[in-house]
């Protein structure tokens, strides 16, 4: 029986996502023996500093990529929003699965919406993109960094450390925690991270056998949307150091891409959106990035450089 080894982080969410991919592969190939290879990453272990301060979201990938290079794993499963915009050779995104809910969720045990939070409320999130949008809509809020897995973050909220926290809806749904969502923060008013809500499978470019196996998981509409989002971010030279949001969706007549660049310090947001009748995510992403730059995003990007 052919064997396929999936490298995965050890968190409950990462294990859920990897087991989901494994189950899909077993359905496609009943003759395939799919096993998980759990491991810790530096991004999981260093929790007392922001991601921007310790090297970015690529820290969630490095150990998994090394396992593939050593021959200890054949592929790795990630939340696509955690995958750097430019994967360095010899790695590629072999599959992007159908997207789940791309929105963020406000979670509070007392208050029912972002608008109902009291003046000066304590809201925690590690994402600069979320912080910038919070600052735009509620400049009075006190914002805090919050790292760790989903249950760790919820526990800090439940212990009274904060009045509210912001997490991704998709992660909560995958863990069966939908009931913790107080309010959805969703497009068009609130933009997610590029690729948010999608699961990605990474493999070695040169491994044609694995690439062919994983291609059966790929969802073309999702891939085309996230290509537009990630291209926009790449054209802006965005990273976890920069508050960038993007969301592409199919509508009657083609694809719409909405983008924003923000500033945590003063809550400024620069927005742009365009539609394309063609499935040209790269072109649409570059066009929206240029619109953002023309509208003043360059100043915000320079301020965070």
UniProtKB/Swiss-Prot annotation:
Originating species: Xylella fastidiosa (strain 9a5c)
Family under the similarity heading: Belongs to the HMBS family.
Cofactor dependence: dipyrromethane
Record text on subunit structure and interactions: Monomer.
Identification of the protein by name: Porphobilinogen deaminase
One GO BP annotation of this record: protoporphyrinogen IX biosynthetic process
GO cellular component: cytoplasm
SUPFAM superfamilies: Periplasmic binding protein-like II, Porphobilinogen deaminase (hydroxymethylbilane synthase), C-terminal domain
Known catalytic reactions: 4 porphobilinogen + H2O = hydroxymethylbilane + 4 NH4(+)
Gene: hemC
PANTHER family linked to this entry: PORPHOBILINOGEN DEAMINASE
CDD domains linked to this entry: PBP2_EcHMBS_like (cd13646)
Main function: Tetrapolymerization of the monopyrrole PBG into the hydroxymethylbilane pre-uroporphyrinogen in several discrete steps.
InterPro entries named among the record's database cross-references: HemC, Porphobilin_deaminase_cofac_BS, Porphobilin_deaminase_N, Porphobilinogen_deaminase_C, Porphobilinogen_deaminase_C_sf
Pfam families membership: Porphobil_deam (PF01379), Porphobil_deamC (PF03900)
GO terms, molecular function: hydroxymethylbilane synthase activity
Annotated positions of the S-(dipyrrolylmethanemethyl)cysteine modification: 240
């Amino acid at each position: 029986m052919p064997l396929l080894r999936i490298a995965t982080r050890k968190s409950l969410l990462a294990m859920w996502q990897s087991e989901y991919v494994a189950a899909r592969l077993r359905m496609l190939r009943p003759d395939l023996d799919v096993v998980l290879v759990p491991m810790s990453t530096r991004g999981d272990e260093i929790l007392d500093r922001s991601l921007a301060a310790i090297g970015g979201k690529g820290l969630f990938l490095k150990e998994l990529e090394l396992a593939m290079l050593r021959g200890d794993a054949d592929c790795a499963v990630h939340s696509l929003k955690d995958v750097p915009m430019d994967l360095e050779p010899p790695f590629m995104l072999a599959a992007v699965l159908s997207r789940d809910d791309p929105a963020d969720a406000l979670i509070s045990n007392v208050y029912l919406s972002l608008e109902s939070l009291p003046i000066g409320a304590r809201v925690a999130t590690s994402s600069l993109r979320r912080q910038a949008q919070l600052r735009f809509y509620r400049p009075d809020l006190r914002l805090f960094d919050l790292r760790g897995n989903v249950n760790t973050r919820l526990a800090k909220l439940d212990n009274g450390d904060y009045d509210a926290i912001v997490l991704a809806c998709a992660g909560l749904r995958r863990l069966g925690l939908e009931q913790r969502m107080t309010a959805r923060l969703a497009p068009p008013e609130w933009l997610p991270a590029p690729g948010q809500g999608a699961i990605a499978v990474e493999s070695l470019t040169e491994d044609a056998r694995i690439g062919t196996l994983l291609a059966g998981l790929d969802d073309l509409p999702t891939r085309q949307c996230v290509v537009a989002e990630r291209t926009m971010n790449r054209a802006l030279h965005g990273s976890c150091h920069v508050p960038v949001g993007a969301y592409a969706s199919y509508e009657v007549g083609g694809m719409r891409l909405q983008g924003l660049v923000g500033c945590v310090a003063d809550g400024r947001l620069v927005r742009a959106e365009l539609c394309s009748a063609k499935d040209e995510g790269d072109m649409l992403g570059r066009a929206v990035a240029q619109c953002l730059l023309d509208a003043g995003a360059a100043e915000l990007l320079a301020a965070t450089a």
